[in-house]
């Protein structure tokens, strides 16, 4: 899949939410949620980013780490806001709380949501670490008992272990989002994701932001979170080539080392995304291709109502002074 060449490139990005979209510009971040047939709720979100607190995180590689953390913080705030508004508007059904849930609410009150989110985050991180770091290493060690080329601790074994682990991580990641795409609510989120990309492309092509103009745009964008995740996994394969099969003679340390080097994968992946977004040549097309292919899963064709929400969010964050434009072609 080839990249689409646009007349200009914007720094504006966003994310799909529950019945809505968040758009983030250089001066403003806005969440827009569909709350009725002809109603769109809009609210700005304020957040101090890590680079604003510490100039050091504006440097290459470090800015990728900061960007990922800030994106996760912003996505959480946006998602909670969109979920609340969608439930209030009846766009998403709210189930009757169980006796246990009522007891928890009486016991912890307003702190309940924070407690649940912290608990869920800890469990989620633990599962992710087990699946993406320790499981691939464990399965490779099992395979090494029957695959001769996997055996030993030399350069050949390191190469195959890195490739094996990396490919398995990509399969797990793609399998996860394929399963998510089968859920009704996630299908709609992926449709809003498509609307977000199409709207950004429409703006970059210097076309008026109308439903008709947005609808005809392509939904695969090189500066997407999906592409970033895929690039991180690929960079992780390369980094794995420099980690011994059993550091200091202890096989358990290899996944630990890979976890410690995760910020490097994040930083390099971020820089590659920025390069792919600014330049269109054979090199960047090769780098961007895996992420664009993965977007066939994480983006779907939106309906006109979704496009209207994306346009509303986009218009809210476009600065009057053009400070969002990275370059003009």
Listing of model-derived features with the role each one plays in the protein:
Residues 111-130, 217-242:
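Transmembrane alpha-helical segments and their cytosolic interface motifs
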Residues 1-87, 91-95:
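Divalent-cation
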Residues 92-147, 157-183:
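Hydrophobic alpha-helical segments characteristic of transmembrane helices
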Residues 125-151, 232-257, 270:
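Juxtamembrane "helix exit" motif at the C-terminal ends of alpha-helical transmembrane segments
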Residues 52-55, 65-68, 75-97, 101, ...:
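Multi-pass alpha-helical transmembrane bundle typical of ion/small-solute transporters
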Residues 64-71, 75-78, 82, 145, ...:
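Low-complexity, intrinsically disordered, cysteine-poor segments enriched in small/polar
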